[in-house]
């Protein structure tokens, strides 16, 4: 009914419109016929356009009131769940090694995690890989340990070496946290390459403690020779409650007489304790070359932590030399010890390698961990 009345009103208005416009047109024509005729035509056109716009607007309003539309939307949600598990009084160790000599690629990775609530746990992992003559190798190791009311220690070391158009990368990370006792973790990684190669290594470690002691150390070294690029970075952090002392020393030397050679070594150590403890660590490396290209790298890392009246020491050394063609050697050692009360532990490791002809590569890795109570 509304639309019918609207159309009736619209038609009536259009019929009445000429009677409204005609007197205005006649008055304009009387004043000035010629110029005002054009103005009249324009005004007439404008008025008709306005009337038409009003009619269209009214018609659209009526259509809007007579019709309705609805829209619906749907939403979806997704949820994910994760589960966690804990274990007490556990120890785990894993080691893997791989070597290849001609046109090969090798990769090794090891990871270990341990958690304890009321007793002691220790975990150690080591991985080493070596390759020569157009090869690529990568190794990564990660270890994490957490303890609630006792002692925990973990150590991981990885080393990789390659020669003759190769690339190697290694990364290691370790994290440890303790609540009311002692925890220590150490990680070391080293990589070396020669003859148009690039290597990069990075390691990071973090530790936090609540009411006792925690220590972590990390070291990384990389070396390359004969048109190569290398980068290394290491970071270590430790925190303790009271009465801790630590000392570390590192030295490196290199000499070359022809062609190109490079060597680098880095070591870092940190220790923390609750009361009356001391720790020391030292590392040294040397390399020399007399012909063609050679590279060597060594890294060592040690960490110790104790609760009361304990001491620990560790030392490692490595040396390598080459005299002809291209050779590379790499050695890595890592040791960690932890004790609860009135105990002492010591560990030492050494490795040496030499090559005199053609192309050769050698790699050695050792890892040891010990823990004691009372």
Curated annotation (Swiss-Prot):
Q: Which UniProt keywords apply?
A: Secreted, Signal
- Signal peptide coordinates: 1-23
Gene Ontology cellular component terms for the protein in this record: extracellular region
Q: What is its main location?
A: secreted
Ranges for region Disordered:
66-374
Tell me where in or outside the cell this protein is found. Secreted
Q: What is this protein called?
A: Uncharacterized protein DDB_G0271670
